[in-house]
Amino acid sequence: MRLLHAMLRVRDLDASLGFYCDLMGMRLLRRREYPTGRFTLAFVGYCEENQGTVLELTHNWDVRDYELGDAFGHVALGVDDIVATCDRLREAGANLLREPGPMKHGSTVIAFVEDPDGYKVELIALPRD
């Protein structure tokens, strides 16, 4: 068994693709519209689906908003240069929720940004070799 994907429901698929692909560096792996079901699925990631876990972005055509609730935490992405990544995101107008710095009660350097739908994305500084 292996983890294939995690799914996020999104209001504006183009805005979400812009965030995850253009700003976060993922690739659009596949996109398919389902007219009879009135939804579109887009799969994005850093690798092919058969090589690792990806994100499924689901856009339901007739839904204008979602209640995020408080059960879901965040998506985490490893980044090589967390300061440069946060600078680039800030310049692009992304909502940085937490500036880069050590996590509470630890030394791992993290930051948080919000995607267009309000999902939290944790950025984790990858160890330098």
Where are these regions (language model features)?
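Exposed loop/turn and edge beta-strand positions of beta-sandwich/beta-sheet ligand-binding modules
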Residues: 38, 71, 107
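Vicinal oxygen chelate
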Residues: 2, 29-33, 42-43, 77, ...
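Short, charged/polar surface micro-motifs in flexible loops or helix N-caps
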Residues: 47-51, 62-64, 82-83
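N-terminal beta-strand motif that seeds the catalytic metal site of vicinal oxygen chelate
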Residues: 1-17, 72-77, 124-129
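Short, low-complexity disordered segments enriched in Ser/Pro/Gly and basic
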Residues: 67-69
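Core segments of cupin and vicinal oxygen chelate
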Residues: 7-52
